Amino acid sequence: MSAPKGPITKFPAEGLRHARRFITTHNKEGKGVFAVDDDGDHHRIMVDGLAVANIIYSTSGNPVDMNDDNDLVYARDNEVRRFAGQINLFV
Protein backbone atom coordinates (compact mmCIF):
# COMPACT_ATOMS: atom_id res chain seq x y z
CA MET A 1 0.00 0.00 0.00
CA SER A 2 1.37 3.39 -0.94
CA ALA A 3 1.06 6.60 1.05
CA PRO A 4 -1.74 8.98 0.06
CA LYS A 5 -0.78 11.71 -2.39
CA GLY A 6 -1.29 15.21 -1.03
CA PRO A 7 -3.54 16.14 1.87
CA ILE A 8 -6.43 13.89 2.86
CA THR A 9 -9.70 15.47 1.75
CA LYS A 10 -12.27 12.72 2.40
CA PHE A 11 -12.97 9.68 4.53
CA PRO A 12 -11.63 7.15 3.98
CA ALA A 13 -8.46 8.55 2.48
CA GLU A 14 -7.86 7.89 -1.21
CA GLY A 15 -6.71 4.30 -1.74
CA LEU A 16 -7.94 3.03 1.63
CA ARG A 17 -11.01 0.87 2.11
CA HIS A 18 -13.76 1.73 4.56
CA ALA A 19 -13.27 0.55 8.14
CA ARG A 20 -16.23 -1.64 9.05
CA ARG A 21 -17.94 -1.92 12.40
CA PHE A 22 -20.46 -4.61 13.23
CA ILE A 23 -22.59 -4.00 16.32
CA THR A 24 -24.98 -6.63 17.60
CA THR A 25 -28.22 -6.25 19.53
CA HIS A 26 -31.36 -8.32 20.15
CA ASN A 27 -34.61 -8.29 18.20
CA LYS A 28 -38.10 -8.44 19.77
CA GLU A 29 -37.85 -12.23 19.99
CA GLY A 30 -34.60 -11.96 21.96
CA LYS A 31 -32.43 -13.28 19.12
CA GLY A 32 -29.05 -11.75 18.39
CA VAL A 33 -29.00 -9.59 15.26
CA PHE A 34 -26.70 -7.04 13.67
CA ALA A 35 -27.80 -3.49 14.53
CA VAL A 36 -25.38 -1.70 12.21
CA ASP A 37 -22.84 -2.49 9.55
CA ASP A 38 -21.11 0.77 8.69
CA ASP A 39 -17.92 2.77 9.24
CA GLY A 40 -18.97 4.81 12.27
CA ASP A 41 -20.79 8.08 12.75
CA HIS A 42 -17.94 10.49 13.43
CA HIS A 43 -14.98 11.16 11.12
CA ARG A 44 -12.57 14.07 11.22
CA ILE A 45 -9.83 15.15 8.87
CA MET A 46 -7.10 16.60 11.09
CA VAL A 47 -3.69 18.28 11.02
CA ASP A 48 -4.30 20.03 7.70
CA GLY A 49 -5.11 16.77 5.93
CA LEU A 50 -2.27 14.70 7.37
CA ALA A 51 -4.47 12.52 9.59
CA VAL A 52 -7.99 11.16 9.95
CA ALA A 53 -9.83 10.17 13.14
CA ASN A 54 -12.68 7.68 13.06
CA ILE A 55 -14.58 7.11 16.30
CA ILE A 56 -16.13 3.65 15.94
CA TYR A 57 -18.00 3.54 19.27
CA SER A 58 -18.22 5.51 22.50
CA THR A 59 -20.26 5.35 25.71
CA SER A 60 -21.38 7.75 28.42
CA GLY A 61 -20.34 5.64 31.39
CA ASN A 62 -19.70 2.32 33.01
CA PRO A 63 -21.59 0.05 33.07
CA VAL A 64 -22.88 0.69 29.57
CA ASP A 65 -26.67 1.17 29.27
CA MET A 66 -27.55 -1.19 26.42
CA ASN A 67 -31.32 -1.24 27.08
CA ASP A 68 -33.37 -0.19 24.05
CA ASP A 69 -30.08 0.48 22.20
CA ASN A 70 -29.41 3.52 24.43
CA ASP A 71 -25.66 3.04 23.92
CA LEU A 72 -26.01 3.17 20.12
CA VAL A 73 -28.16 6.30 20.28
CA TYR A 74 -25.63 7.98 22.58
CA ALA A 75 -22.67 7.03 20.35
CA ARG A 76 -24.48 8.36 17.27
CA ASP A 77 -25.62 11.63 18.84
CA ASN A 78 -22.53 12.54 20.88
CA GLU A 79 -19.22 12.93 19.14
CA VAL A 80 -16.24 12.19 21.38
CA ARG A 81 -14.47 15.45 22.22
CA ARG A 82 -11.96 14.42 24.86
CA PHE A 83 -9.57 11.52 25.19
CA ALA A 84 -7.10 10.34 27.82
CA GLY A 85 -5.24 13.31 29.20
CA GLN A 86 -8.21 15.59 28.39
CA ILE A 87 -6.78 16.75 25.06
CA ASN A 88 -9.49 18.48 23.04
CA LEU A 89 -9.05 17.12 19.51
CA PHE A 90 -12.32 18.06 17.82
CA VAL A 91 -13.14 21.75 18.20
UniProtKB/Swiss-Prot annotation:
Keywords: Oxidoreductase. The keyword Disulfide bond does not apply. It is an enzyme of class 1 (oxidoreductase). It comes from the Eukaryota. GO terms for molecular function: oxidoreductase activity. Pathway: Secondary metabolite biosynthesis. Its EC number is 1.-.-.-. Highly reducing polyketide synthase; part of the gene cluster that mediates the biosynthesis of annullatin D, an alkylated aromatic polyketide with a fused dihydrobenzofuran lactone ring system that exhibits potent agonistic activities toward the cannabinoid receptors. Belongs to the virC family. This is Oxidoreductase anuC. It comes from Penicillium roqueforti (strain FM164). The gene is anuC.
